[in-house]
Amino acid sequence: MEMTSSYIRDSIKNQCSVWIAQRQGRAKDGFDRTEIALLKMLMLAFKKESAPLQSFLEEINLIPVSISYELDPCAVRKARELRLIDDSGSYEKAEDEDLNSMIAGLVGYKGRVHIEFGQIDRRAVDSIEKLGEVLDQAIVRGLRVFETNEFADSFLKGESESM
């Protein structure tokens, strides 16, 4: 972790952007929540673990990024895994399954894609946990709802019977 922190610090000091995922893996429910440990690692990168959070936030420019797509190329895989877990209580992944899912997610057809760069209100942040909440809220605000999302929502609510 120290090597990763050092890389992040050096990149930011050299005015290079660093893209960091909120958490390891993907949430099956579609809502990836920011891992607090990730934020602590960022603070560690700047040796600010004992400094005020606000001074850390002033030093780095955290930009929440929302990525929405019309179709999920991994939807069938996710649904299958969730169904097997529901039916048997567990699911054992095949060798290279995660790698194959990542490839499918990267290169698979997504339909329309929307990317939005958000902002956070630094004044609203008084703890590392609150920072995670503020980032998550900004990401959710930036998501675009496509017709496929609306259909899925109405289908789950029993308001739509046909596909």
Residue ranges, per PLM feature:
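Membrane-interfacial terminal anchoring regions of lipid-handling membrane enzymes
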Residues: E2-V18, Q24-M163
